[in-house]
Amino acid sequence: MKIPYGESNFKKIITQDFFYIDKTEYISLLEQHGSYNILLRPRRFGKTLFLSTLRSYYDILCRNEFEALFGHLAIGHNPTPLKNSYQIIAFDFSGIETGSHENVRQGFSGRTGDSLRKFLVRYGYSQGDILRIEEEERNGPAAMLSRFFALIGEAHIYLVIDEYDNFANAVLGDSLELFTEIVGKGGFVRAFYEVIKTATMEGIVDRRFITCLLYTSDA
């Protein structure tokens, strides 16, 4: 059995015989106690791996793999009502360049566009749909996301974000002015999350799971 040092892909760990500490019992607790969860933990705590676990568990396209991936784990013995019932939209905002307003905007917009394209390809949307999203790229991440939600209509969405605060904390450490520009009123980051809030209120986003960093003295 192999040690999964630095490995955060749940499916790979399970199917390639890596050592795995079963934390899937927490999935049922999360499902019972709210639809909108935030996991605040230090670096190297396993946040990204747990997020990957949730994606495999809830993704409707993974339903035929459920027994192979989860059958021997706690959640496999007691699955929840919502298993494999969602389309998953996943964002990862770690490692965005924060040297300037344009750096952050390009990085954030690029990550947003990549995630939306991957979703549309995975769930069988047309090339025309992808082009409609790309047409909004020049208008910023909020415009892309707004078009995306309009496009997918009544799809049952589970939205996950890994390290949503990573770049914002880096910016805050360097420049309060830049932080205010991107996160404050009128900022493109704030606009992005306002679109998510609206989609949640409209029932397009049914559940959310977000990871963020708990900063310690050695972080």
PLM region spans:
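N-terminal pre-Walker A segment at the start of P-loop NTPase domains
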Residues: 5-25
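Structural recognition of the conserved hydrophobic beta-strand(s) that form the central parallel beta-sheet
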Residues: 160, 207-212
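Mid-core helix/loop region of P-loop NTP-binding domains shared across ATPases and GTPases
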Residues: 119-163, 186
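Conserved small/polar residues in nucleotide/adenosyl-binding loops
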Residues: 215-219
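P-loop NTPase motor core
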Residues: 70-117
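Substrate-engagement module of ASCE P-loop NTPases
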Residues: 148, 181-204
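Conserved lysine of the Walker
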Residues: 47
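Post-Walker A helix-loop "phosphate-sensing" segment adjacent to the P-loop in P-loop NTPases
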Residues: 57-67
